[in-house]
């Protein structure tokens, strides 16, 4: 980011939101460097260059600059999630609230979430609505192009029918008034202020921040996975599932109906059915 003012011509054709304005996180730097290293290694293998510049770094230096580290995952507890769901918010936060709740229901990465549309909604023979899509991040390594199938719980259906996945706020995820900022404002308004631990590289020590300051689209996926993991454990411990049954295996290995029941329990939602037009069938 220090080179933006020094060499403005390099950034003249780049969209403003893509121009670096602050120091990148170490993990981001490490990932980009690994990509560059792979590129130069291939050039070296093809004899297009004599030697990769990464060889000049030395083993120890390369290890340092490419090191990735991750804090303990930050997510909403079930009671915190339900608090957000049940809190009336100002009109300025309503769209962000509903987009956030919907993304938490699916646990989708932000790029996948932004690309969703009504064509991705399917109804099973049992009347269970679910979302079906190909995750973009793993598309290249997904040899058989296996799709993700996520049951749609009751509150998520209402949001989908209202917005049809057309959330204007998702046009800008980052930025001063983007989706991530609105998520933080939403969580602050709902008083989601539990202290969470974050490692500060400048002081080389842990610092503690209110959870709402850590709000972003990434929080949705982590919240989704934590809620499902905990409800599986709770159902097993309480005797609802026998040891070795499919219900205590990894979530993704369960049948659609099992996953639907599990998700309804995790999010405190009623079990329901719909017709092919997504109308709820009263029983």
Predicted segments with their positions:
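Short, charged phosphate-coordinating catalytic segments
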Residues: 41-52, 101-127
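Conserved tyrosine-mediated DNA breakage-rejoining catalytic core shared by Y-recombinases
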Residues: 116-159
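Short, polar N-cap/turn motifs at the start of nucleic acid-interacting alpha helices
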Residues: 120-128, 214, 230-252, 274-279
């Amino acid at each position: 980011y220090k080179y933006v003012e020094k060499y403005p011509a390099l950034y003249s054709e780049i969209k403003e939101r893509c121009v670096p304005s602050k120091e990148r996180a170490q993990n981001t730097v490490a990932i980009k460097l690994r990509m560059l290293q792979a590129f130069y290694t291939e050039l070296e293998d093809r004899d297009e260059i004599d030697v990769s510049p990464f060889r000049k770094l030395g083993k120890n230096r390369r290890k340092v600059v490419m090191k990735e580290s991750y804090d303990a995952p930050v997510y909403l507890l079930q009671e915190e999630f339900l608090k957000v769901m049940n809190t009336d918010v100002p009109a300025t936060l309503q769209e962000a609230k509903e987009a956030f709740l919907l993304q938490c229901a699916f646990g989708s990465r932000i790029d996948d979430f932004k690309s969703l549309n009504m064509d991705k909604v399917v109804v099973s023979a049992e009347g269970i609505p679910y979302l079906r899509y190909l995750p973009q991040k793993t598309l290249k390594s997904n040899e058989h192009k296996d799709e993700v199938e996520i049951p749609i719980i009751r509150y998520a259906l209402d949001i989908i029918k209202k917005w049809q996945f057309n959330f204007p706020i998702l046009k800008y995820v980052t930025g001063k008034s983007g989706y991530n900022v609105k998520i933080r404002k939403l969580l602050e308004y709902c008083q989601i202020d539990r202290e969470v631990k974050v490692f500060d590289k400048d002081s080389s020590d842990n610092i503690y921040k209110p959870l709402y300051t850590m709000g972003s689209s990434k929080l949705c996926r982590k919240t989704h996975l934590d809620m499902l993991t905990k409800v599986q454990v709770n159902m097993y411990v309480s005797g609802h599932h026998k040891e070795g049954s499919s219900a205590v295996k990894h979530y993704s290995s369960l049948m659609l109906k099992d996953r639907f029941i599990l998700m309804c329990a995790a999010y405190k939602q009623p079990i329901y059915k719909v017709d092919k037009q997504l109308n709820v069938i009263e029983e």
